[in-house]
Design a protein with these regions (language model features):
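Active-site neighborhood of divalent metal-dependent phosphoester bond hydrolases
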Residues: 1-61, 85-100
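Divalent-metal (Mg2+/Mn2+/Ca2+)-assisted nucleotide/phosphate chemistry catalytic cores
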Residues: 72-73, 79-87
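Active-site-proximal beta-strand elements of phosphoester/diester hydrolases
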Residues: 65-71, 135-137
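Short aromatic-enriched loop/helix-cap "lid" or pocket-rim segments at secondary-structure transitions
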Residues: 12-16, 77-81, 172
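Acidic, His/Gly-rich catalytic cores of divalent-metal-dependent hydrolytic chemistry
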Residues: 83-174
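Active-site beta-strand termini and strand-to-loop segments that position acidic
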Residues: 60-62, 152-153
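Histidine-centered divalent metal-coordination motifs
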Residues: 5-6, 69, 119-124
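Short catalytic/ligand-binding loop motif for oxyanion handling, primarily in non-cytosolic enzymes
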Residues: 9-12, 67-68, 74-77, 126-129, ...
Length: 174
């Protein structure tokens, strides 16, 4: 698996860093707190180590497929710098925020011309969307949308509805 921005925030919290605890993180921490005391510390250490060991992205099928949480530009594929890891986790932002307080993101996929297909998510959309050999499969399961997967190499999209709404989106995506 590849890490997402929320995974890395949880890892930082488990390592004792000061992070802003939002609803999703609060839920995760509350679930961890239900563990018996004799298992909690070991679990937190093991979880933090697992998350810390994840790579930012995968280059698969002899370079024909890239999987990253928020995307991956062609020139970054297969590299492991902090800049590459940040792009894989967050994409690229303008430095501005929208009317909902969320970062305004550059549409990196609109300029993508790489040879590998890139599968990513991070920014929920109503339907999976192919653009320039990239596909965003984040169809907002956490917000009551769909959980979507891409079968490769068939390029078959499979979506199943969320069982429930786990969180309310900061801005509508449907």
């Amino acid at each position: 698996c590849v890490p997402g921005n929320h995974d890395m925030k949880l890892m930082r919290k488990l390592r004792g860093k000061d992070v802003q605890i939002t609803h999703g993180l609060a839920n995760s921490l509350a679930e961890i707190d239900t563990l018996p005391n004799e298992h909690r510390t070991a679990f937190c250490t093991e979880l933090a180590d697992f998350l810390d060991g994840l790579v930012s992205h995968y280059v698969l099928d002899e370079g024909k497929l890239v999987v990253a949480y928020a995307g991956m530009k062609a020139e970054m594929q297969g590299r492991g710098s902090a800049k590459v890891r940040d792009f894989a986790l967050f994409g690229e932002t303008t430095g501005e925020t929208d009317e909902f307080g969320l970062p305004v993101r550059y549409n990196w996929a609109s300029e993508y011309r790489g040879g590998a297909a890139v599968v990513y998510g991070h920014t929920p959309i109503p339907e999976p969307e192919w653009l320039n050999r990239t596909i965003n499969i984040d169809t907002g399961c956490v917000f009551g949308g769909m959980l979507t997967a891409l079968r490769y190499p068939e390029k078959e999209i499979i979506s199943v509805p969320a069982i429930q709404t786990y969180a309310e989106p900061a801005k509508p995506f449907m």
